[in-house]
């Protein structure tokens, strides 16, 4: 069996490497690569904006008869994402950038313009200093002044940082928090005072209105008679029961009273009972009664006799 991984290869005795034909490819052969847009651009066909960093499947080729210090220049072909129009741009090794060729316009980039301006100023300065020694001295003086200003600003920043380093931010926050709490407490006290003042004013106004209404009020009407309680009839004692109780009490009182025995006198004055009536006064039914009454009876006996007379009349 042969080996799974062949390490040695067989070369026949008549092997000649020069006889192996070489693959000849065109010099402008294109390769498909994956790249991102190197700058912001706008399509000339449809006006679609293509932002920097958008990915494309591009075709890459080498530009013929163009090079910078032996470095080849490459051209890329992409298609617009909206109208599929072809857009081409190529590398610029001299400025380490890309240049737009066809199909789109490059959008404004302030950073690139700033870099170009700095390069232009630097180049002009070098050209002036090349043949003018006084210009070199003047530029050095300006540079030294500028350096001194920068150092002074840097020292001020350092001093400021040192001053801020000794500041206790926690204490500042606590103080601010305390002041805020005091302000809130003061606001609450003011609200309470205003509320108390409003309540006092309302009470005073109500008292004034009550006094004025009492002065102008009409005389009070008599109160209506109280309505009887509907359940009071349940607690009433029947009239017959009240009469029976009254009779029992009268009989008991009559039994308790004992009339005093008085000797009968011969004259007719002893037969008169009661107090003589005034002249012209009507005689009562008791005066017509011929039954004699004992003059020595007590008030309880008279009360019992008065009750008996009422029962007889009824």
Swiss-Prot record:
Keyword Zinc appears in the UniProt entry: yes
Keywords: Metal-binding, mRNA processing, mRNA splicing, Nucleus, Phosphoprotein, Spliceosome, Zinc
Annotated residues for binding of Zn(2+): 43, 46, 80, 83
Pfam family, one: Saf4_Yju2
GO molecular function: metal ion binding
Region (Disordered) location: 178-238, 253-314
Biased composition (Polar residues): 290-302
Subunit record text: Component of the spliceosome. Present in the activated B complex, the catalytically activated B* complex which catalyzes the branching, the catalytic step 1 C complex catalyzing the exon ligation, and the postcatalytic P complex containing the ligated exons (mRNA) and the excised lariat intron.
HAMAP family: YJU2
The protein's name: Splicing factor YJU2
Organism this protein belongs to: Mus musculus
Highest classification ranks of the organism: Eukaryota, Metazoa, Chordata, Craniata, Vertebrata
Name of encoding gene: Yju2
